[in-house]
C-alpha cells in the first residue's frame, strides 16, 4: 500500500512504551530488558513496512537517581541502534519530551539532550534527535534554547501545539490540540519562528528534503478532517510568511 501510494514512512515506537508503561531507562534490569524487547519488535515491524526511520522516547526517572537513569538510557539506546544496524540502514531518532509536566521523560532539557546525543553519535552515525514545537514550551525553553545546542543532531522535526498555562485547562499537557486552540501556546506566528530557526541552523537548507511532520489530534468531538485542514492552513500561511521574509 505504501509503495503504491508513493509515500515515505517513518515508524513511531513511542506508543509501544507509553501504552505499556515500559521504560528503556528503567533501573530495574528486568524492566529495561522488557522495554528493549518491545522496541526490537517495533524495529522488525518498521523494516517490514519499509520505514526509513524509527523513533522512540526516554522514560520517567527519579531526580535523586538521574545519572543512573541517564546511563541506563545510553546503554539501551546503543543496543537499539546496534540492532537496527544489524537489520539494515534505517535511521534512529529519540524524540525530545517534557521532563516535569506530562510525559516527564529524562530527555529532556537541551543541556542533557546534547550530552546524550553526543554520547550516542560517537558509535552510531545513524542516530539523531526528533524535536517537536509542541514540546518546547513544555520544556520551559524558547525555540532557540531548545534547537541551537542540538542543531547538529536533529533528524526529524515535528510541528504541533500544547496547552500549559494551567492544569485545569482543556487539553492541558502533551495533548497536541489544533492550532489556535483556546489558551494554547502555538499558532501561525510560532510556526513561522520555528521554521525560520530550522532554516537558520541548516535543517531546512533547500538542498535536501528532511522530515518535517505534524502531530495534531482532535479534542473532544472535533472533526478530524477539520483539524487536519487547520494544520495544513497553518503551515501554508506560515511558510508563505517565511518565504516573504527571505
Residue positions per predicted region:
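Active-site-proximal loop/turn and secondary-structure-junction residues that shape catalytic pockets
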Residues: 15-17, 58-62, 96-100, 133-137, ...
